[in-house]
Amino acid sequence: MPSLGLVIGLSLFSFAAAAQVYPVSGVWAAIDSQFPTAANETCIAVKTFGVEAVSKKSVSEMIIFAKDKRYDVKGDVQTETTIKSIKLADGGFRITESFSKRGSWLGLRKKATYILKVLDPLTIEIWDAASMTRYAKCGSQRPPI
């Protein structure tokens, strides 16, 4: 009969292995017709001003994907969400997220579902119930060695 410690250790290991992560990572800036700068100019604004680029209206929206978390900055609003599920769908990924504890009201957690499509290594689209937004990846544009 296995020891209780071994059983607990194995169960914790299996939960860690089941953690889901986003299919993309890093900083992404929205490509928006009301902000008619080229994608590389948008990313320069993000590199120069960071999150302030959004509040200064140099960039309409910025998203940071980090493992199972997504940080979204739009105007003066910043949100943090965590993946609840990710599934292949419609040539992309159907992602369901829940908002962080700071976004909860009376212990209720709001969920969001959308489709994320990877168009190429530097461009993604996010389709939600109301609209589609295209994003350009900010960071080194050099291919890895």
Language-model segments: what does each one mean?
Residues 24-68, 106-108:
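Short, solvent-exposed loop/hinge segments that bridge or flank secondary-structure elements
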